Amino acid sequence: MRSYLVNDTPQKYEVVLRQQEELFNALIKAKQIDEASEESKDEYCILCVHDPVYTIGKRTVEDNFLLNMQSLPAPIYKTNRGGEVTFHGHDQWVGYPIFDLEQHGIGLKHHIERLEEAIIFVLSHYGINSHRSDKGAGIWVGNSKICAIGVRASRYVTMHGFALNVNTDLSYYNAIV
């Protein structure tokens, strides 16, 4: 069964991260307990908006910040997702799919491609021409990134996901590369 948890009221990052981790760990545990079963395990997709926050992925280095990290206009959270630093804030929709990729017969690369395709489809619905780039995961409009993607997977179970700028205060990006 797949459930969608949607909240358009700004959420504290640490609260949603804890929720993700609980669902992620529960899905991994369910797989370990009943590996022989072909029965579908519960999957979730959290869609929300965050209070302003910077998150740093595994590839983040201090050079990714243009300002001293202590003087940033929002708090920083270290995560276990792929990618570098990104900003989450009001008027930006963030999606956290907690899926078992084995149930869908795909790997992590294909999962990321599907996320990109879904974002491109949604943007086209609003008349926005967007595309992938060889600069890395994410979606672009012209030379500007409109959607960041950073995912973690373990035992084919995913967490973290995408951040789609809708009407985001872009000044927060002035602090990061």
Which residue ranges define each predicted feature?
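N-terminal lobe of the biotin/lipoate ligase/transferase fold
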Residues: 1-140, 145-146, 171, 175
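Catalytic cores of processing enzymes, dominated by hydrolases/peptidases
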Residues: 144-177
